């Protein structure tokens, strides 16, 4: 069996898919015939999401971090880094890495979920706020600017807080940004 992932729709109506580690596209104008685009540089990708412009997609690799692939440039880079191995205390590390990336409608930002360090989000493990779960995924938003973000760095500005600024946003499902 093949591993098939739906990546998303381009602005011109092309549906992009990955079949194992090959990038495929289909469109109504081509009678929905699958067309090979190129071989992807990784075989451990999941949670793929395409930007609205149809030029880039973000995904999670087996290393539990977010990566970006530029289709036109045929290039890729690691978007996030954090400690995911050797977990001894859920309040210290991003135990599950980063998940479920999604682009803003203009492609300038990437939103995803992650499990922030206790020191970065002081209320993240307050049972009165988030219940008794050991780990809480938070909404994280970063610029799509070609840089790798170290999510273990203090005050890196990636955790999204609502206007009242008291508690971060808990996010457990795929993000859809319209």
Where are these regions (language model features)?
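Sequence signature of WD/YWTD-type beta-propeller architectures
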Residues: 1-178
């Amino acid at each position: 069996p093949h591993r098939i992932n739906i990546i998303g729709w381009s602005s011109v109506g092309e549906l992009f898919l990955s079949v194992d580690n090959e990038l495929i596209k289909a469109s109504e104008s081509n009678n929905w015939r699958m067309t090979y685009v190129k071989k992807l540089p990784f075989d451990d990708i999941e949670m793929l999401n395409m930007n609205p412009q149809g030029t880039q997609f973000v995904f999670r690799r087996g290393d539990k971090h977010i990566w970006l692939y530029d289709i036109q440039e045929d290039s890729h880079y690691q978007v996030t880094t954090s400690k995911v191995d050797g977990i001894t205390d859920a309040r210290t590390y991003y135990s599950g890495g980063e998940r479920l990336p999604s682009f803003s409608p203009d492609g300038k930002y990437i939103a995803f979920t992650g499990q922030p360090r206790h020191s970065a989000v002081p209320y993240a493990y307050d049972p009165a706020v988030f219940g008794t779960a050991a780990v809480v995924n938070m909404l994280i938003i970063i610029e799509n600017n070609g840089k790798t973000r170290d999510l273990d760095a203090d005050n890196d500005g990636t955790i999204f807080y609502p206007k009242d600024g008291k508690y971060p946003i808990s996010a457990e499902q795929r993000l859809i940004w319209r």
